[in-house]
């Protein structure tokens, strides 16, 4: 797994200082006006004052102690320079107490108070705090002097002094017991947030932007990532979705995930305030989760990461796991705590437009909760002091450092940050921190002691900032690039605009004696740039204000041979723009809601609810500018129109609605996709969720991004009753009182009174005296929940809310698990029977699912099926067949003794699979000792769904009684037998400390299935789970699974390997006579699924060649040169062939006849490439197929044309190398006069970049004459633009 790391900047801020970018992009607060030269001073002062006013527990302690002393008529003390000392021995003489070299612990009084030493010991044995011989409040701490010259006699050691106490310890303890530090803190806290909430919100947003700018200018944030961050900063909810990171359902205070909307596999950015690199980009959330898990293995990262969660969440309980334990389990890669499940376990989406206000409120609440824990308790569970707001301030100080480096903040950020945030081990410049960290004893090394001693560091920083006030002249002078250039190059600003590419460079010397040039480039938009020479004719661009290098921005100094003038050219900043998309779904031909109202108007007839939904959906479509969201909404609108026609077939509005539906179809499906459209829209009832997914899959397939899977996914959708159905379930709100994710809603429980069976009349419920099924329902739930079942069901205001999946209920509720007198009684079975009857012909998901659950169900099924098909791609049967493919292997297996078979399975193959019968389980248990002796570590079973019961399995194995659902499922599997085979299998795993894994698949689909596609889907997902959980080094396992899962079955386009083929183990069965036999993989099963009619659109991509990309290509690092092409050639072959390849290339380039073919005329490739091919043959080189490339280009306005180019090639070491003698007809480096030789794909990429090609397509054959003239990109790649662009 890798994060995205490319950097290809064409953003408008490139070439500017971080300071300049910040002022241009930040929101328009009064103190950030572009021309207000004092804005930095105001910015820093406000920030410092806010820090300085932060409620300070150390100051509060001082206030409480001295007010308590004054009430007793005692003198004040400074608790920061007064110490609570504990001695191991003492003696007295003439009323004085002498302590020798026996100081065991010493804390400043402030530290002792905040660590609750006095309050915790208040009701203990008070000998410690009352005894002058043991402890006291002293004016000197661990630096107490020794007096060896004072002779008290030979029996005494040197005396420790001064030896008089200021107060007895009990004096301070009484004050703290009578007055709560927490209550005092809370008062200051409320006043603080009332005053600074808005400013703190602004500071969060400013720091968010500043950190992004710093990363962007350092090239650790891509263009795409920076744009996503900016969209987040500006609250563009249409572009990005913000999710609060959570671990096992515990939300962090301030870590967020940013996802770009509208992409098939959205890119995601993780934002960790205080991290060394706060923004980390990933290709998907799975990579993000794995990255976090990896970093948690490092203790310093773990410590830092914990600080993003409140102390309240970090406490452990007997019945729940806190965040600390959850993180520990994830870091240890505990099988029961996989990172991909428990990171983002219960995602919470935040309002993008209100993000920083939300984060401010979360910080406020966190600070309140943490302070409660910190000040009230000093238990081991809470000893790690969370700096909360203070650490947030520290993470934001680098924004000030970016704006005004001269402030001199006394914190070394580089050493205080980790990848997962700030640790409390902050390094402070100088020795001030060590001087503060006075103290010896058991608590000195605790994180609590470290934390409370950082508060003075923050205060010192705040004082520096709040006092930082300078005149205009002292603030850095350059607030625009123009000002900087004018002053440094000693010209007036107006003259800058008149500098032309023809003018000679203006040159100065910087402080490092480097020659710095100011020139205007002679290409593209002719920007004014500052350069520093690298060597020869090469220069690097530098920022005008800071003189920092802009990486990758090379500029060449060239001479015009005609005029002999010197010019500076660069392609590092070509004019750019968003990539063109052939799949831009234009709405030019789709009515707006206003037009629809006019066309569908019926005099005297009001607009009904169905019509209102159509209008609302149409408005959302026109408001959306995200491709995937828009096409999904359009399919949903088509679905609404179909449902409207179904329910109101005689409506006078239908003609208008049908016309609108036609418009939507035309906008969604290109003419070239007509056959595909018919296939997708022939899905019964045209379910919008499936149509959205399938069109997106087809688009990706047409673009060459994915494999050929659309046809099989459509067949699967046609055979799945949920995928193919339109949504008819519940689209309303969920009451706040519901504390579980709701999957199904029955809006009015009176529907239970309309079913055929009167359950309330059954003998078991006669004594309840209920008069209807709906009246019976609350009692059924009450009694079921008292037995530990159906806990996620709630009736509120006559509506039933269900959080269990249908499959969970199906597997756990049955006549076997729910018998009268049994542990779970009859009530759940009655409830489930009522549900099954009330669903009618629609099916449970279609009738009652919530919109979110239904959409997720549809897309997840199709996505999982797509992954299942990927499992079959390029699967190599060879390793399995080499061992088990022998036609006589079953005889060899039978010839061995039982012990020999077990030993062979467990030591040669890492395991064995059994058919999941009670006979197989009994056989296994009878031989369990032998399996264990041969290293058995795990048992896996496909009859239990992992996502439903794996957690309860873990709880059972650990001795917990909380496994009701698992218990009920075992009753079901064992047909009510309390001593059944499956229960004995689980108990044996517990007794022998063997891991037990459920690998069954749960997706509201209940096997067995009759059609092969659904069987394939179910099988593939179980195999994927088994691979993830079992295919690891060091594991030895036994798997129990249905026989249809064990070996190969027909698959899509190729056979579907079985569980044993993937795990490379044998499949076995125990027959009715108790004989253990090998199950061979039948050759007749290794075939594709039979398809009666192969659709002509099944292969959507062009049969030859490939699309390089659906975007506009451009150069990113200047024109290619001989030197820049050299690595591409060297890396194309192995090192031992490199010299021979370069000799052939040199021969071609030095050949006189070949050089005579070089041509710069447009279109010359048609005539030149055959001559090049002929010359290559004459030179004794193996001729290649050549290559041709074609692309779109914009002619202006709305018009597009296509262009093409072709080349010859030669073969070497199995690769083809383009030899292009006509490439100079395209823009190029002025020093580039040679023949272009590159691997074919690299050649195509360079030609595309130099021509700013749009959606280029390459075929691996040279074309001439009519073949070249007719060569054009596939029509579906032609960009579709609107006038607005």
From Swiss-Prot:
Principal location listed in the UniProt entry: cytoplasm
Coiled coil: none
A molecular-function term among this protein's GO annotations: phospholipid binding
Membrane topology classification: Single-pass membrane protein
One CC-aspect GO term: extracellular region
Keywords: Cytoplasm, Host membrane, Membrane, Secreted, Toxin, Transmembrane, Transmembrane helix, Virulence
SUPFAM superfamilies named among the record's database cross-references: Cysteine proteinases, EreA/ChaN-like, PMT central region-like
Residue intervals passing through the bilayer: 402-422
InterPro entries: Dermonecrotic/RTX_toxin_MLD, Papain-like_cys_pep_sf, ToxA-like_C2, ToxA_barrel, ToxA_C3, ToxA_N
Subcellular location: Cytoplasm; Secreted; Host membrane
Biological process annotations from GO: symbiont-mediated killing of host cell; symbiont-mediated perturbation of host cell cycle progression; symbiont-mediated perturbation of host G protein-coupled receptor signal transduction pathway
Function summary: This is a dermonecrotic toxin. This osteolytic toxin, induces bone resorption. Potent mitogen. This toxin is associated with the severe progressive form of the atrophic rhinitis, a major respiratory disease in pigs.
Note: Closely spaced cysteine and histidine residues may provide the toxin with an affinity for metal. The sequence shown is that of strain NCTC 12178.
Name of the molecule in the record: Dermonecrotic toxin
